[in-house]
Amino acid sequence: IALLPCNLASVLYNKTQGAVQVAAINTLSVLYVVESGDTVHSIQDLAGKTVYSTGKGTTPEFAFNYILSQNGIDPQKDITIEYKSESTEIAAMLQNAEVTIAVLPQPYVTTVKMQNDKVRTALSFNEEWDKLGTDSSMVTGVVLVRKAFAEENPLAFNEFLDEYKASTEYVNANTEEAAEWIAEYGIVAKAPVAVKALPESSIVYI
């Protein structure tokens, strides 16, 4: 059993010739357009601008390009997207006001906003995706399992799924207590960041 980004799950599905399957969706989009200014209020406002992002060749790039294209913006011609290797790099640039517009995931969005009050959340990928009227939500993370394992251990696997669902519900309902655990185990550096980031992190069990 593994908790993985959806694009990696699809790669493993193909590499194993279908030996793995998605058991649940655990994360919708955690991506946001943020800016140190007040110029972006719609996707159309990004035309002609430079936006910094991470995840070239992965979900952030594919999702961003799709949203742009569906809004009449050519990702190759109408906007300049500068890709960086790490979200921490973009976060540091935003904190120092070197960048005005960027695509960042949670909890980096919360961290940056807490350290620089000039940075604001301009757009949510979840909201922009839903505006397109597709039949599905934007998915970021999934629970992946080997089919053979699930078939050979149905009781244990179903127990895991039940406990995982309960854990998801608990975290969403008890953000302050969950934030303390998240900080203690080093998932996010500080509990106050986790408290603010959790409601924006699209943690689900579907």
Residue positions per predicted region:
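Short, glycine-/small- and polar/acidic-enriched structural segments
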Residues: 1-76, 80-83, 100-106, 122-123
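An extracytoplasmic/periplasmic, membrane-proximal ligand-sensing/linker region
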Residues: 113-114, 176-206
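Pocket-lining segment of extracytoplasmic ligand-binding domains
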Residues: 7-8, 82, 86-180
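Short aromatic/hydrophobic-glycine micro-motifs
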Residues: 73, 117-119, 187
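Short, solvent-exposed polar/charged micro-motifs at secondary-structure junctions
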Residues: 32-34, 131-134, 206
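Flexible glycine/proline-enriched surface loops and loop-helix/loop-strand junctions
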Residues: 45-49, 142, 202-205
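Short helix-coil transition/hinge motifs at the ends and kinks of transmembrane helices
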Residues: 75-76, 129-136, 190-194
